[in-house]
C-alpha cells in the first residue's frame, strides 16, 4: 500500500545538525509515535513504514526520524563509528521529540517511542530523560545496550522479538528482567531479526497498536 496522503517530509534541528524525517498525521490523532531506526537504516525503512501505516490506520500519528545526517550515515557505514553510540542516538531522539512539540497539530498529543535494533536503546535512554513519554515499543531491539538505565524507565514498555532471532532473545530477556515499569515481552513465532516472514510485521503492528492503546492517557482516543 502507498504512503498516507498526509505524510510529509520534514527536517528538524539537533545542535548544529539538521536531520530528516517523515511525519504522518491522521485526522483526530490519538497520540504521536517517534520512530528510531537501527544503524544502517533511515526514515525510508520499508519495515518501519509498514508499521507506521498500520498505526496511521489506527489513528496514531508518527514521525520516522533519521538519527544520523547523510555524512554521518556514510561514515558509520565505513567505520561503524555511530553504530553503538547510544548517547548520540538518544540525543537525536530527544531532538525529534522537541520538534514534534513545536508542531501545532501534534504539540498536545501524548508521546510514545518505537525503536528497532539499536534504535531501541536510543528510545529507552530518551524515555528516561523525557518523563512525558507514556509508552515504548522495541522491535527486534538491542535494549541491552542501555541496560544500566533500564530500571529508571517509567513508560510502559513492550519488547517484541522474533521467535527465531536466536542471538537477540537472551539479550532481550536479560533486559526485560532489568525493567521495573509496566512491561511485556512478546515473541512472534517463526520470525527472524528483520521480521521478513509472511505475517510477521502485521503481528508487530497489531501488538504495537494494542500496547499504545492500552496505555493511552485518559481523555485521549
Regions found by a protein language model. Give the residues of each.
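Conserved alpha/beta-hydrolase "acid-adjacent" motif
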Residues: 166-171
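Active-site loop->helix "elbow" adjoining a glycine-rich segment at hydrolase catalytic centers
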Residues: 116-120, 141, 164
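Catalytic active-site module of serine/aspartate enzymes centered on a nucleophile-bearing elbow/loop
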Residues: 199-221
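Short beta-strand/loop motif that positions the catalytic acidic residue
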Residues: 153, 159-161
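A conserved short beta-strand
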Residues: 132-143
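Serine-hydrolase catalytic machinery in alpha/beta-hydrolase-like enzymes
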Residues: 9-106, 194-199, 203
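Catalytic histidine neighborhood in serine/cysteine hydrolases
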Residues: 179-194
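Alpha/beta-hydrolase fold nucleophile elbow
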Residues: 105-117
Amino acid at each position: 500500500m502507498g504512503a498516507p496522503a498526509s505524510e510529509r517530509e520534514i527536517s528538524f534541528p539537533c545542535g548544529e545538525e539538521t536531520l530528516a524525517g517523515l511525519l504522518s498525521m491522521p485526522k483526530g490523532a490519538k497520540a504521536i509515535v517517534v520512530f528510531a531506526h537501527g544503524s544502517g537504516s533511515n526514515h525510508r525503512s520499508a519495515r518501519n513504514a509498514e508499521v507506521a501505516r498500520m498505526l496511521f490506520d489506527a489513528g496514531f500519528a508518527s514521525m520516522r526520524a533519521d538519527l544520523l545526517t547523510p555524512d554521518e550515515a556514510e561514515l558509520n557505514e565505513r567505520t561503524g563509528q555511530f553504530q553503538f553510540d547510544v548517547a548520540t542516538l538518544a540525543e537525536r531522539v530527544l531532538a525529534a521529540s522537541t520538534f514534534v512539540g513545536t508542531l501545532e497539530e501534534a504539540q498536545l498529543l501524548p508521546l510514545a517511542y518505537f525503536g528497532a535494533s539499536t534504535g531501541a536503546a536510543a528510545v529507552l535512554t530518551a524515555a528516561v530523560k523525557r518523563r512525558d513519554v507514556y509508552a515504548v515499543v522495541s522491535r527486534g531491539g538491542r535494549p541491552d545496550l542501555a541496560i544500566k538505565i533500564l530500571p529508571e524507565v517509567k513508560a510502559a514498555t513492550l519488547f517484541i522479538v522474533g521467535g527465531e532471532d536466536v542471538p537477540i532473545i537472551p539479550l532481550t530477556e536479560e533486559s526485560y528482567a532489568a525493567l521495573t515499569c509496566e512491561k511485556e515481552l512478546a515473541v512472534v513465532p517463526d520470525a527472524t531479526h528483520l521480521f521478513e516472514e509472511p505475517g510477521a510485521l502485521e503481528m508487530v503492528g497489531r501488538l504495537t497498536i494494542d500496547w499504545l492503546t492500552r496505555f493511552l492517557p485518559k481523555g485521549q482516543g
